[in-house]
Amino acid sequence: IGCRKCEEVCLSDALDIMGKDVSVSELMDIIMQDYDFYISSGGGVTIGGGEMSLQTDFAVALLRECKKMMINTAVETQATTNVANYEKLAQVVDQFLIDIKHIDTTQHKALFGIGNENVRRNLERLMDLGANVVIRMPLVRGYNDSYDAITGAINYAMALSKRGNLQRIDILPYHQFGRNKYQKLEMIYPIKNDPGYTPEELDRLEAFFKQFDFEIRLVRH
């Protein structure tokens, strides 16, 4: 499983390798092409996924090289893997962007197959380590956009911010940008009849967020 030999021997060329194996030094050569821009703009390197913490050792090695060159580092993660991964990452990551898809662990398990205990554990450990963290909550109609789900996530973020450097929570309203990926993979798109939130609905959400003494950023697409 995962050996990719099927792609090499596929008679009809129906399977293609999307991506390639690279070393840390090869990636650094690519990163350094934009070094002047990173330094002048304050930008940097963000590792995402899939789930980047499944390759923690490689990510740490790459980000350590970035730090040697004074390049800002960030990771996007669901924070569902072992806490030891995040203890390693905290040594080389300037900014964690961490998803909370549902604050209620029972609902989280019903929707995604696992609870959110690891997410909470890793967030709390990062707070203790002094890491800079932004929580991100994808908002999907009928799944996690109830009053209890939204306020629960915000209240949890506010409580964490008193424990460490949790900077804000980003709310990411559902959109259909991923539909083409499903088509390319010949998969059925699971949300067929929801075009996303209207501008008026987003305006009401922003007005609702103003009652909280905490930075909540609604990301409009």
Predicted segments, located by residue:
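Active-site anion-handling motifs in enzyme catalytic cores
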Residues: 22
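A cross-taxonomic marker for long C-terminal extensions/tails that follow the last structured domain
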Residues: 200-221
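Conserved beta-strand termini and adjacent loop/short-helix elements that scaffold enzyme active sites
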Residues: 18, 172, 219-221
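Cysteine-centered iron-sulfur cluster-binding motifs in ferredoxin-type domains/subunits
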Residues: 1-13, 51
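Conserved AdoMet/S-adenosylmethionine-binding subsite of the radical SAM
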Residues: 25-28, 32-177, 183
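Iron-sulfur (Fe-S) cluster-binding segments and ferredoxin-like electron-carrier domains
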Residues: 13-19
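A charged helix-plus-loop insertion that forms the helical arch/lid used to bind
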Residues: 185-195
